Amino acid sequence: MLAVLACLWLALCTAVGPLYWDFENGTIANWNWTNTAFFVLSFAIYLGLIVIMVRFAAGQRVLPRAISGRLSRAGQQHSNQALEPSQSQSVVADSNVSKRHATAASRFATLGRWITRGTNRFWKLALVFFIGWLWVPTTLLAAFGADIRSQIREFSWAWNQWTGLQQPYIGFFSFVPMDIYPTAHYMWPPDSTYLTDQHNVVLTVFYGAVAAFSRYLTGSNDAGIVALAAGQMLLAVFCCAATANRFLNRPWMGVAQSTKDKNGSSTGNVSSTTSARIAQDAAPQLAGGRARFLILAFFLCCPLAVFATISITKSPLFAFSFVWWFGIWYELTQTWKPEGKRKGLTATAPIRLPRHSFVAFVLSTAVMLISAKYAWYIIALQIVLALIADRRRWTTYVVALLIPTMLIHGGISLAISSGAIIGGDPIESRGVQLQMIARVASRNPEGISEEAKKNLSDVFNLDQMADAYSQQDADPVKSSGIQAKKVSYKWRTVMPEDMTNFNKAWFEIVKDNPVIALDALLAKCFGYFNVTDQPYVSMDYYVTSDYVQKNSTWIKSYNHNWRERITGFTRSWGKIPVIGWITHGNFYVVMTLLIGAAEVIRRRWLTLMTHIPLLLLMGVMITAPANNFERHMLPVAFVFGFVVLTYWRESLAERRIARQAQSSASTTTTLPQ
């Protein structure tokens, strides 16, 4: 059922694409037979992919019997013809072809062994990533947009305040950093402060301090920004190498096997999850050369990963720390042992995380928390799931997940409540609702009742809201921007009590204008789940943004044209049908969702527990301010190769168990009675 729902959602997002590409007149009311055809075809393709994955895992025939039989007969016919004496010339030709095939296979096998040998240690993988990415910070220096400029500005104002410069909220400083996004004035503490949690306060302080030190030494922010980009690239090297080492080399296998031997083998009837884990223990420790090549090729060649290494935009930092975190979860599930005697399964002692993995678990959790405000929701859910699935290692999850969350998230909340910093405006979380109201105000203003207008009048200027509406981005509706902007959101005068009837007004507007409201929702998020949709903001945007190419001090003069050529190439590549899909995040989002559906069908609950964060990240995409914003898809894209490898390994394990069961049953039936 869940698989069908996933396919229906993906098919809907694919089918409505042509409708919403018409920004002015697009609406689901214009649905026609073409959209129906897209919907049916997409649904069939997505469901077919899930069926193929499920049948492969079950050891069943992937291709229909008629097709596989035809291919088999064609191969047999070719072999028979090759054996006919009258076809001696053909035999010689086929022999030469076979030799060439054998030579090619031998060379590929040798290449695979060399790739494996060159990536079978953490330090080797780190060296590959470092060399492969070295050209990025050395030729492009850094990539950034408006966010880091705001963070630097915030820290500068806060630093001036800390060092004794009086900066009241009014007068000459009437338009301050908190007015840019903006944050409602009622949230500002009575004692003026200019440090906010809009861009994650820890990052704001760190980035701002580095930029301030850069200004002290060089007179501009540029050197500090370049240093931050280089540091992020090194962090990306470390995170990706650590996780690749865990997935490709599984260095804990020796420890797990010795623990298993010490405690005895499991016997009796076992669940599918446990039996697959047991069979996987017997699988080769190292991944093959092909898997290594494809995973490394993605990280070293895909624009998503390449440009993210130097993009100082919060999301890449979260994405790389998430990759690190994701790898530790894989180690935890691979070293999971059953608890107690259930279904005839003998209990074994739990395998504790090695010290370096435990420290990595704590640090990756901390970096996630300081780089994305929604990280604590993901971590909180994982704490609950982990304590249910693996409660014998509860101390690991409490120390590595719960304590960092309490310290970082709780500390920031305490600082906000004490007035030391300014929290984020609650309006930020209402992007979907705002887009619905704004689209109705733009397309059918008469459809808003007088009561709804009255309930919204103290919060929004509906005329300005209609003018500011963009189906791709909710930020203009929230009055984000510098002074020359539409004042849709009355952040200067709104009070908490003014929001009391907001939900009531929103519901009434949606009830009176259901089609327009549905348009607003779909137009805001369909691109994340439609592989044919081009990104609203791609990762190459930050490489050639005006903040880099025009408004920087000296970065703009360094390889200016080279940046334009590189981004021009990646944009051209991304526009090529099918081939260009692999350069965009929505391809990896769609495929990850399909793999997750297949895992549900195969009941791989332990693996699904570690993949739940990917589903939550897809929910973040739907509620994000903009449609098809590639930086929000980075975590899912970065771990996609590891998700595929996990599914492949567990499928082979299940097939092995099925064959063993069939062999055992066959042996039993042939024994004399």
Task: Go through each PLM region and give its residues.
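Short acidic/glycine- and proline-prone juxtamembrane loop motifs at membrane-interface regions
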Residues: 146, 307-317
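Transmembrane-helix motifs of polytopic, lipid-linked glycan transferases
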Residues: 76, 227-284, 324
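Start-transfer (signal-anchor) and selected internal transmembrane alpha helices
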Residues: 1-11, 33-135, 281, 289, ...
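Membrane-proximal stem/loop segments at transmembrane-domain junctions that anchor or position
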Residues: 161, 166-185, 421-557
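Transmembrane signal-anchor helices characteristic of membrane glycosylation enzymes that use polyprenol
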Residues: 7-18, 118-146, 156-160, 404-416
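Membrane-interface anchor segments at the N-terminal boundary of transmembrane helices
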Residues: 221-231, 235, 520-615
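Short hydrophobic/aromatic helix or loop-helix immediately within or flanking a transmembrane segment
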Residues: 154, 166-233, 635
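Membrane-interface alpha helices of multi-pass inner-membrane proteins
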Residues: 349-352, 357-371, 383, 402-408
